[in-house]
Each structure stands twice: as C-alpha cells, then as structure tokens.
Amino acid sequence: MTYCSKANQPSYPFILPDLPYDKESFKPHFTRETFDYHHGKHHNSYVQNLNNLIKDREELQKKDLEEIIEWSSQNAEVAILNNASQIWNHTFFWYSIKPHGGGKPSGKVFEQISKDFGSFEQFCAQFKQEAVGQFGSGWTWVVYHDNKLQIIKTSNAGTPIVNFMKPILACDVWEHAYYIDYRNKRSDYIDIFIRHMINWKFVEDNLIQ
C-alpha cells in the first residue's frame, strides 16, 4: 500500500524534492529564509543522512521510501527510520500547505469534519490544542482511521504510517518550522497554518483515494 505517492520515492539514491511553490509565496506569513533553512538545510540533511546510511545496504536500496520506513520500524534500525520518516513527513507537509490556503474546506472534507468533530470550529480548536500542546519537537496529523478522522501527535520523527494510519494532513511543529518568523510563539504559527496555509485540495485527495 502506498500512503501518498507524492511523499513516497521509488528507490535509492533518494533526492530532495522540489517545493511545489515559490519560497516567496507565503509572505507576509513566512519569509524565504524559513524555507531556505527548513527545506534546503533540514529536509536536505535527512536525505543525505539516509543515503549515507544505506549506501552499503543493497537489500534496502531496492525498497521505496515507505517500505524502508516499514522495514526499519520493525527491525530496530532507529537511525534509518528517523531519517526516512523525516523525508516522508516533510514532503507530505510541503503538499499539506499552499499559498493563500487555509480557511474553511468544502465538499467531502467539510462533511467528514462536521461528522467527526461536531463542527469546523471544534475541529480547529482541537487541532490547535494538540499542536500547541506537543511537548518538544514533533508533528500534528489528521488521519483517517477506523472510518473516522482523528487528530494525533507524533514526537520527533514519528509518522502515523508505521501504525497503518492514513494521514491526510500534516503540521510540522519542530521549532525549525516556525522559529525564524515566530520565535517561541507556536500558537501564532498554528493560527496562521489553519487560517492561511492548509491545502484543502490535497487533504480531500488523500481522504477520497
């Protein structure tokens, strides 16, 4: 099963994927510098680390990224798991946002949110509570699991796909995602994420696939 074809990569050597938008396009909410560091340095370092970790592991070089995540999670290969997961998580995150995004969704996503959370406002409140409340670095996710939407948190490089949960939205709450522009104000960052950044088309595509 492929959880997200846009986040997956077919085989070694893995590459840093291009951003699906210009780095300047999130102004005034985020500066180019944030994307230069977040994508060009942090995300890229995970790609380089994983390639170095498996450069002599022919059995792993034939696997796609999601297969490496699954295999390493089952075989206590922590360094491989952490770097592979962070490549996948970040790529999924880049598609979870778009310039001039956010606001209220429509269609199937809005219907499912209303069904599972009571209202869009309640969903936003719970999402913000979970994201702001994540202790230390990690991720906040919306997943479709057990026939309903759920908001979950993962610490550090954790990813829901190791628990066979289907992610439909990711929010990076590592400090490097927002510290250049928002310093320690994670709450402000989450407000901007919800109001101006969520790519609801990507969310809907994940939900209905």
Swiss-Prot record:
Cofactor comment: Binds 1 Mn(2+) or Fe(3+) ion per subunit.
Keyword Cell membrane: no
Organism listed in the record: Rickettsia prowazekii (strain Madrid E)
Family: Belongs to the iron/manganese superoxide dismutase family.
Catalytic activity: 2 superoxide + 2 H(+) = H2O2 + O2
Protein name: Superoxide dismutase [Mn/Fe]
Enzyme Commission code: 1.15.1.1
Keyword Transmembrane helix in annotation: no
